[in-house]
Amino acid sequence: MRKVLFVCEGTTEVFLLYKILNETEKLNVNDKLLYNGNLRISNIKRFITLFFYNSNKSLEIYIHNLEGKDKLERFSEEFINSREIDDIEKILFIMDSDYQKENYTGFDRTKEKIKNNIKKVNEENPDLKTGYFITPDNKNDGMTENLIIDSLNCTEIVEYIKNVIEEVKEFPKAEIKNKAKSTFLMITATQNPLRGSASAFLSSCYDKIDKENPKFKKISEFIKNNIK
């Protein structure tokens, strides 16, 4: 039995992973995590929770929701001291880049954080395979919201609102602290059903994403290739 563990930064990354895995052939979701046919985050209660499994029971996929990047070190310590460290074959991290601070890009800062924690768990279990995907594209600063925005089918709306945000930012009373989230909220306000968060949008409006978009395929292929 192969066991793969995905460690996600937050609810948005968990829902994105769920949607991608849920469209993968021969995978079955743990129906204890569902409510009215969709994923319910509050049902992910255990430290490491069974997420999906394949039809012949040769693969189990587990999930851990960090609920914030600052919880990564605590997770690593708990994982190192758990019996699961000997059972898991591969551990994969999906996290935001975020943005530059001082001389460090958000991507470099997040990559260093992940690699430091990979080093810790590999010291305890050298055979544990590891990997990571840092949104939006595993090389640039940004967030999972950027990945979703750039993969939407409504490209004309996306480009229009991106330009609007740039203009609004210049208004004296504008208080835009997170451009990606502000852009995302304005775009989702044009869609039906209207959803105010990335996780809720993924839950109800996943069909509005272009699955063949190169940026989306990059994370989709990372996930699917790592469970082969």
Segment roles from a protein language model:
Residues 21-25, 79-83, 114-125, 152, ...:
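Hydrophobic, Leu/Ile/Phe/Ala-enriched alpha-helical segments that form helix-helix packing faces
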Residues 89-189:
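Activity-critical C-terminal alpha-helical subdomain
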Residues 182-228:
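Structured mid-to-C-terminal alpha-helical surface segments
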